[in-house]
């Protein structure tokens, strides 16, 4: 038996089908859960990763979920009838599968260079945006599909230089229109390739400025750079102190100046992002620490969700998350000690909105550090996280017991 992917479509010749949801209730008491048995089949029919579907159930039903792709086991806490889950799945299909123009399900999720989500329709050719305010959008941005087309996201390169702005090319390469993936002509040179859609703003600005300059002949034998380990460390330290720190300080001061003492005039998320790009601090993980200290006041628990989409766009790696949590630690331990008891609620918001990963929250709550605050302050703050950490550990142990059965 199969049903229409778009259940509102009653055309007898409608050819897009999927299996109906199959589910069964497991356990009893506080540990009762609903196992969704055929998520993999539904995932295949919708061309969407199975975790997206289960996470959507969790967000819409207000329930915790357990996802084990390897074991093909997907659980949603609580009792949920298949009919109810099918209705919730309709919402997922409308928001994250069907084309916003022709309502055809032949779409792929595209993550653009600006970290926006769009549905690329293979039927009508249109691209329609998805709602970034939905919690699942944050999850998708942090866990992109295996094959992301359109934005042509590349896997992390093996060298650090390949992951910086400009694709690891020198300024002169960018000015000459060379691309990181430009084919070689056999002489070591590359053929210019123009990808205006993927090219970042900084590269375009460099090209525009460089096009007005005369060619300069560089003779390799006229100068040399000391590449000893000591010299590299010295230069790195000097750059960090004189450039990065200054730019981050300027960014933090700008936020506080714009917001005012009561923070009623806090810049919008768009303005915050544009200013960070202008000061070139988006690639510095320490921006997370600055944001955590500058954006919040006594109402931090409610304010976190207001910036959900922005944080998802900024906190793109564990290092960014670690710095953000360090900023939270400074905010509570040094500036608002009276708010330390609210830390479990703060962690709930960060966890439920997929801003900070479970791994980073566990690390933060179980090990003190003197990186951001004095050791004693760190212990006091992180000790307050214990109720939430205990809940996380209990949830994990319950899932393990279910798997053993």
Curated annotation (Swiss-Prot):
Domain W2 per the UniProt entry, residue ranges: 241-402
Superkingdom of the source species: Eukaryota
Residues modified as Phosphoserine: 170, 172, 228, 397
SUPFAM superfamilies, sorted: ARM repeat, Translation initiation factor 2 beta, aIF2beta, N-terminal domain, Zinc-binding domain of translation initiation factor 2 beta
PROSITE patterns per UniProt: W2 (PS51363)
Keyword list, A-Z: GTP-binding, Initiation factor, Nucleotide-binding, Phosphoprotein, Protein biosynthesis
Comp. bias (Polar residues): 177-192
Annotated GTP binding sites: 27-34
Entry-linked InterPro entries: ARM-type_fold (IPR016024), IF2/IF5 (IPR045196), Transl_init_fac_IF2/IF5_dom (IPR002735), Transl_init_fac_IF2/IF5_N (IPR016189), Transl_init_fac_IF2/IF5_Zn-bd (IPR016190), W2_domain (IPR003307)
Residue span of region Disordered: 143-202
One Gene Ontology molecular-function label: GDP-dissociation inhibitor activity
GO cellular component: cytosol; eukaryotic 48S preinitiation complex; multi-eIF complex
One of the GO biological process terms: negative regulation of translational initiation
Residues carrying Phosphothreonine: 191, 317
Further remarks about this protein from its record: Present with 48300 molecules/cell in log phase SD medium.
Family assignment from sequence similarity: Belongs to the eIF-2-beta/eIF-5 family.
Assembly notes: Monomer. The factors eIF-1, eIF-2, eIF-3, TIF5/eIF-5 and methionyl-tRNAi form a multifactor complex (MFC) that may bind to the 40S ribosome. TIF32, NIP1 and TIF5/eIF-5 comprise a minimal 40S-ribosome-binding unit. Interacts with NIP1. Interacts with SUI3.
Physiological role: Catalyzes the hydrolysis of GTP bound to the 40S ribosomal initiation complex (40S.mRNA.Met-tRNA[F].eIF-2.GTP) with the subsequent joining of a 60S ribosomal subunit resulting in the release of eIF-2 and the guanine nucleotide. The subsequent joining of a 60S ribosomal subunit results in the formation of a functional 80S initiation complex (80S.mRNA.Met-tRNA[F]). eIF-5 is essential for cell viability.
Protein name: Eukaryotic translation initiation factor 5
Provenance organism: Saccharomyces cerevisiae (strain ATCC 204508 / S288c) (Baker's yeast)
